[in-house]
Amino acid sequence: MHYVRQEDLPFVGSSHEFVGAEQGDAGVSVFLFHGKPGSGPGPHRHPYDEIQFIREGRGVWTVNGKTFEGSAGDIFVIKAGEIHSFKAVGDSPLVQLDIHLSPRFTQENL
C-alpha cells in the first residue's frame, strides 16, 4: 500500500498531480483540477484513455470538434488520441478528478 496526502502532491498550474510512476509505481496518474471560471487547457491529446469526474462547478468540453456541457456528477470518458479541451464556466470553480490510464503523464498540445 502507498499513502499520499493531497497537500503533499505537487500543485502545477491548476492541478494537484499524482503521477503513478512517481508514487509507488501505480498504474494510473490522477489530477485534481481546480479551475477558476474561464480557465482550462487548450486542445490536446493523450496516447491513453482519460476519465474525468466532475465534482463541483460547470464546464464546456470540446472533444473531436463536438461541444458538450458538464456539471457536478457528470463523467467524461475520453479515448486515446481524441483531441479535447475544456473550460470552467459560470461563477464558481470547476473541480474535477482526471484519471489518466497510464503511470506516466503524456500530453501533446495542439
Regions found by a protein language model. Give the residues of each.
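Conserved short histidine dyad/triad with adjacent acidic residue
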Residues: 15, 30-46
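Structural motif
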Residues: 58-60, 67, 83, 93
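Anionic, Ser/Thr-rich low-complexity intrinsically disordered regions
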Residues: 33, 63, 75-77, 97, ...
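A short, N-terminal "cap"/entry segment at the start of jelly-roll beta-barrel domains
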Residues: 1-28, 109-110
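Short acidic-glycine-tyrosine-enriched beta hairpin
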Residues: 66-81
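Ligand-binding loop in jelly-roll beta-barrel domains
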Residues: 80-106
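Short, conserved beta-strand element in jelly-roll/cupin
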Residues: 34-35, 46-61
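Short histidine-centered beta-strand/loop micro-motifs
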Residues: 20-22, 40-46, 87-89, 108-109
